[in-house]
Amino acid sequence: IETTGSDQEWYDYTAKKWANAKTSDGSMWVWIPRYAYSITSGYHKSGADINSTAPEEGAGTIEVEFMKGISSESSTGRTNFQNVSGEGKWNIHPAFNYGQTVSGIWVAKFEASNSSGKIKVVPGVSSWRSITVNDIYTNCLNYNKTLNSHMMKNDEWGAVAYLSKSKYG
């Protein structure tokens, strides 16, 4: 799909139509919009089958409400967030604050591969192997300094994981 920055219909998370983008080097990215979440069942519990869809057997249930940009209001009008741990508590995910609040983050759609010593994110190729954490960090920083590219942080990974376990995933 080709689109412009003003096209409001190029993605629809409710319909599981993800905002995918391809950069000039062919790398593929997906937009993770800022959201609030609540773990509504299974908080701090483990099950026999982590992949089960039954909360009593698996990883529990996560509800997600997308935020309106960088405001403190969700798409449903919720403005009260506890931002504390616990089942049933609503939290604005911390991954969307990297020195300042952002409306979302671009995440590599696939594991990074090596193309002549440069990062490339494309399907169907082997992941970059035999690289030190220091070199991963440096390569990620240098990918696009203007856009603040960096090695994924734990909370950003958590944002992707939580979203994938919600009804949108």
Predicted regions and their residues:
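Residue-level detector of solvent-exposed, low-hydrophobicity positions
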Residues: 17-18, 42-44, 135, 164
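Short aromatic-cysteine micro-motif
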Residues: 25-26, 57-60, 64-169
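A motif-centric signal for short, conserved binding hotspots located
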Residues: 46, 51
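Short, solvent-exposed loop/turn elements at domain surfaces
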Residues: 38-45, 114-119
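GGW-centered surface loops in extracellular recognition modules
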Residues: 1-42, 149
